[in-house]
């Protein structure tokens, strides 16, 4: 969740990767997995992200939380708000790095999967960090300069050829946990393992889950590159308006259906009434499998078309007779 809120703040322009982040005494005191940041040490936000994503640095997590929200407590409030927004009904955070082993700090595999999906789908640039296996950072403190090597805690990156990330975690109460992502043949999967008895078991179980997922999954992809006919406009300054698909269409089947049977139908009116706004929905492309709708893609107006007034009709009449 710390990474999710960090990338969200980056996307909103509240912070930048090159921002300097100063380490507080509290952040530097964090136990567990750490990158040994010193009090008053300054690192860029991007370096802090690497410390969190690669080495699970609890000290870096707290430093970033304090930088974004002013305090870890305020940041944790944001974490719980985001969890509620995402429908993570079985999750409650009490810190930003997972060190707390109290009954009030809890989650489930499903909720972690929801959170991981939100992070990776909205901010795929996270893979630039979670995919790092090893990288050096430089500590600049009053004691001088020193190099520290970040080693990924996600051993699946080397053990499973399709792995792309994402994040490990462990405490004495939670045991060994992992949210793992992988990509194969255009299919992106997330596997979440919690409560594994040892650190090797979580990677083995995640690999088993991911391999199973790929074996039972089949992807239907329509890039929607076919041209759509212009739509007639009534009462507008233009007689027609171009339309376009909003996006490609993807459907993941896990039931063993033949995706050759997918049919696409275009739902558009014969004509539209002016005015119309660019980007507004004109209709949709509907996808059916065995007669059942499996999804749709909005079809949008490509341009604005204003409503015609008297002078517009006059110009059209003059154009007709003069040309």
Language-model segments: what does each one mean?
Residues 88-92, 103-106, 110-323:
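Domain-terminus/edge residues, biased toward the C-terminal soluble/receptor-binding domains
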């Amino acid at each position: 969740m710390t990474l999710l809120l960090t990338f969200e703040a980056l996307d909103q322009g509240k912070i930048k990767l090159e921002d300097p982040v100063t380490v507080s005494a509290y952040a530097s005191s964090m136990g567990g997995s750490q990158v040994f940041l010193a009090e008053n040490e300054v690192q860029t936000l991007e370096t802090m992200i690497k410390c969190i994503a690669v080495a699970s640095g609890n000290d870096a997590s707290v430093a970033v939380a304090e930088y974004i929200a002013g305090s870890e407590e305020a940041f944790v409030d944001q974490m719980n708000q985001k969890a509620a927004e995402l429908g993570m009904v079985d999750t409650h955070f009490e810190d930003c790095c997972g060190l707390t082993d109290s009954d009030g700090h809890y989650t489930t595999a499903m909720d972690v999967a929801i959170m991981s999906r939100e992070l990776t789908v909205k901010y795929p640039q996270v893979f630039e960090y979670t995919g790092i296996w090893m990288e050096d950072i430089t500590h600049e403190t009053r004691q001088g300069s020193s190099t520290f090597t970040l080693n990924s805690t996600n051993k699946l990156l080397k053990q499973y050829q399709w792995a792309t990330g994402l994040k490990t975690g462990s405490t004495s109460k939670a045991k060994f946990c992992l949210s793992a992502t992988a990509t194969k043949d255009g299919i992106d999967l997330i596997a979440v393992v919690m409560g594994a008895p040892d650190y090797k078991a979580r990677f083995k179980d995640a690999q088993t889950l991911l391999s199973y997922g790929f074996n039972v999954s089949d992807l239907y992809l329509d890039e929607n590159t076919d041209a759509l006919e212009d739509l007639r406009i009534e009462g507008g300054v233009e007689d027609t308006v171009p339309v376009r698909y909003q996006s490609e269409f993807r459907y993941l089947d896990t039931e063993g259906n033949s995706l050759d049977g997918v049919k696409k139908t275009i739902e558009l009116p014969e004509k539209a009434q002016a005015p119309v706004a660019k980007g507004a929905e004109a209709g949709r492309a509907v996808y059916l499998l065995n007669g059942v709708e499996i999804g749709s893609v909005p079809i949008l107006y490509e341009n604005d078309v204003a409503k015609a007034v008297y002078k517009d009709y006059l110009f059209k009449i003059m154009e007709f007779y003069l040309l």
